[in-house]
Amino acid sequence: RANGRKSFLRFYDGMDIRPRETEITVALKRLVTDASRIVFLTGHGERSLYWNDKGGLYSLIQRNGRNALVNQGFDVDTLNLTGRTVIPEDIDILVIAAPEKRLSPQEQGLLDSYIAKGGNLIITGEPGKQELMNGLVKNLGIGFKEGIILQHEEADWEEDFIVGDIAESGAQQTGVGAGLLARQYQVAFPGTTALSFNAGYGFQGVPIVEYAGDTLMLALKRQLGGEEQRIIVSGDADWFSTEGLALRKDDVRLNNFGLFMEMLHYMTYQQFPVDNSRPSPTDDTHYLDIADIGWIKGLFIGLIPLLVLGGAIGFR
């Protein structure tokens, strides 16, 4: 544009290389509005955007991938808190993905200040890190329960491979998982702990993903400064890794990527990714009487074959 704002519309890797309506809409929207800024915390062994192995998040920044965040309306960056005095206010979503080490007291103070000011946040943990994670979220009313969730329904699966259900209440209140619920999708959490919630910290807690009575993902929200603060916490970090977003299992309709996109849509107040879905048509069923079947049968068995035969003879 004349004001210097630029937007890129890319061709992508794979068989379907051309941009679709969603990517075209995103590119146009970025010319008239700011992209959402999503920042990943580093410095404590968190899942890295630059890992392309198990647990890595590289697919989120691979520019030639259709589903990369940059192609869905996001500016992506990392943040190391060492030497900082404040977390920047222009961050739309701060992601803390399964840290391996505790934040220092000064870093924890910066995070607590960011939360107190109404910053939006995604936090993911892992089994075995409950004590560390509970220290991180101590002011949110969230608890990472001891142990690991196991399943015994599918003998061919790993015991810690959990297929969770979208919570209807959460989908209704936040929209996260609503599209999956409507199309009867589930999500896979390969190694997760359960979450607890205490409402005494000023947040409303809404379950997003559940399994056998346990909450695996929880949304927190509260009104602060005239705007709703939104925080999402999950007991697993693998579900949105490069491998996790592509997980498939026979006889189960999994859609981790869909959950990830709907989560970001919620966290950015419906700005990005762009939602180009349409309402399902209401007039999609036609009912026939018994009397109608006769002429339909005659049409397909008699008239149409005769027309085809006549056309073939005429063509010769």
Regions found by a protein language model. Name each.
Residues 49, 54-272:
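Acidic, S/T/G-rich, low-cysteine, solvent-exposed domains in lumenal/extracellular/periplasmic regions
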Residues 1-63, 68, 273-277, 285-302, ...:
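Hydrophobic targeting/anchoring helices
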Residues 153, 280-282:
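A glycine-rich phosphate-binding loop feature that marks nucleotide/adenosyl-phosphate handling sites
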